[in-house]
């Protein structure tokens, strides 16, 4: 929690609500940078109503104005345009009536969580990212974010004729998965038997790491005893063969998918990897075929060679992007 002595009388609220964490911050009027208020684990709350009640209780404990925020922007891991927001990778759901009941007078905007990440990209500094491989980020060119975390998010930022950033959202994590190597084809066969249709999110998220690991165990005839992505990632860092192969495939598939996005969007401004997995296992990412697969685009390999790939290390680009989005509407 922030020190209540630094909280202004009038303020705006931003939230970044994913499948694992719900983060909230305040933004003083006229500012575009958020100041952290609270972070909650989604698993600790049975529904969104409960976390909002907890947030309001924490506000009161900090001496925040009872009237609530002037304006609110929530970035959610769900399609934001529906009347009822149902989170893709958690049981939470809510509608505007619930928000209005909790937030009272606040003007409320809801955006996709990865639209918020994309909006933050132009504001990131060199200290907010780590580059993987060569390539550059051309000013004023399209930038794309892909984020394996609890799920897989994708969004792009382009610029209008006045050089203002425009975010193009979507559900790019749910496009069809296309294997490259023979082993990836074998993994796909097992995932198809389990899920039917296989999107890239079936591989490029925390649960996807487990899916890959279990499929490889079945193919290799080895016991796949680890049950969490954290355990698999840690085991890979300690040279467990099956876990290491799973993480290597995870980052190779991420490289292929990121390269496809670069071709699709013309992302000469760079491709940015968000979410919690890449920063946590950046040592494995650097040793993997991520960049090689990003470049392996046949006749268009040279096109991708010039495009930089970056891991976002900023603590919460979603909150930053939500604050910037809100600032454009003040």
Model-derived features: positions:
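ATP-binding/phosphotransfer module of carbohydrate and carboxylate kinases, centering on a glycine-rich
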Residues: 2-57, 68, 185-330
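Short glycine-aspartate micro-motif
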Residues: 12-16, 71-73, 109, 143-147, ...
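Short, acidic Gly/Pro/Ser/Thr-rich loop/turn segments
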Residues: 22, 79-81, 151-155, 211, ...
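Short, glycine/charged-enriched secondary-structure capping and boundary segments
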Residues: 28-29, 87-90, 124-126, 159-162, ...
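Active-site nucleophile and cofactor-binding loops and adjacent substrate-binding regions
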Residues: 42, 87-90, 109-116, 135-138, ...
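Short beta-strand-loop/turn "lid" adjacent to the catalytic site in phosphate-handling enzymes
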Residues: 60-110, 115-128, 145, 279-283
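ATP-dependent carbohydrate kinase catalytic cores
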Residues: 107-138, 230-251
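Glycine-rich phosphate-binding loop of actin/hexokinase-like ATP-binding domains
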Residues: 128-200, 282-285, 290-295, 301-304
